[in-house]
Structures are given as structure tokens and as C-alpha cells.
Amino acid sequence: CDHLDNRGHAGPRHLIHSDLGRVEWRQSLPVCERLAARLGVELVVVRRQAGDMMDRWLSRWEGNVARYANLACVKLILPWSTPSTRFCTAELKSAVIASAMRRRFPTGDVVSAAGIRREESSVRARMPVWRRDERTVRKSGMGHTWNPILGWSRADVINYVRSRGDRLHEAYTTYGSTRVSCAFCIMGSEHDLRASAGCADNVAIYREMVELEVLSTFSFQGSRWLGDVAPHLL
């Protein structure tokens, strides 16, 4: 917002959060609400109408089993998202957010600012600072994605948050996570999975996800069973 103010931006600004339901850290929405209040902007919360992230995994498995039973396919596929098929991001975040933005802003240009950084992955390291976003292009307006902190380090982010008198998500400050996404992420490190399991709020979804591992016989991550992360909780 400081940069936009300095550039003389006078258009509407909103924060938008796609809530993934049971798999979210419980503090994620309050963190967004606190940020919106500090910036003085409206927080728009969107959700997938057909159910949350866990519902998506469950329905994917149930549909696959039904096809297999009806001889419509020759092998079962895993219920989970994977690094190469991240429908968790595509369907429950990007698509839902883009749809909400098109409805809210039927005309004029839309700039979607995201907080990704090059340090986070090799894929993000290759992303441009600015690009056309086809998901938010409308007949009467262009769509763009802007990654304003692409070159920031983790320390830069922490220092900026503190300089504004705000505080970090409890996943960092209380449980020692190195990154925050879903409580249990298909791309999360073993350290972060264990950190998440240490939060009492995440125990119920942990057990539900392990139950799907058992039912499907597919591990949550290719080389790691979620059930092995915190077996004492089962």
C-alpha cells in the first residue's frame, strides 16, 4: 500500500483470501483480518462452493473408486494434490479468487498483487514481476498479476512486518514453521509437517487426512506418510 500511495494510486483496493476450510491454520483468517484493519481496506473472503480442500480430496477418491468399480478405468489414482497437479492452488485458490474479482470488477483494469518470493522455489525464481493474467481479463478490462516482493528475502519480510507494528502468524512464532500454507501441505517439509502437528487446532484435520491415507493406501506425499509424522496423535 505504501508503494501505491507513493505512486498516486487512487483506485479501490481490497485484500482477498481464499479460505480452504478444515485444512487452514485457524489463525490464517484472523491474520488477514488484522492486516485489512491496519491497512484500512475491505477483506473479501471467498470459498469453493462445492466444499473445502478436504472435501475435494475425499470426492476425488470416491469418484475414482466408483470409476474403477464400474470398469471405467484400469487403476486407482491417488486422492491428493501433487507438485505437478496442484489442483489445490488452481481450483480452490486461483480460480475462485479470479471469479470473485471478475464479478466485483466487471470493468476497468485489475491488478492482482501476490506475496510470492524467488527464494521460495525454483519455479517462483523464474517468475516475472509483472505479467498479463488471463484469468482476470474481461471484455472491458485487462487483468495483471504483480509480484511486488519477488526479490525480498525472508528476513526482509519479517523486518517489514515488525516495522509496521504487526506480528507474524503463529505457525512461525509459536510452532517454528519455515513457511505457511495449509496446515499440512503436499509440498511441506517434514519439519513443517511436524510443526503443524504440534498445534492442537490441527489435530482433527491431521487425523482425517491420515484416515484417507489408510483408506486409499496412498501416502500424502510421494515419499512420506502423514501418519508417520505424529503417530502419537492417532
Tell what function each PLM region has.
Residues 1-234:
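Nucleotide-activated chemistry modules centered on ATP-dependent adenylation/adenylyltransferase
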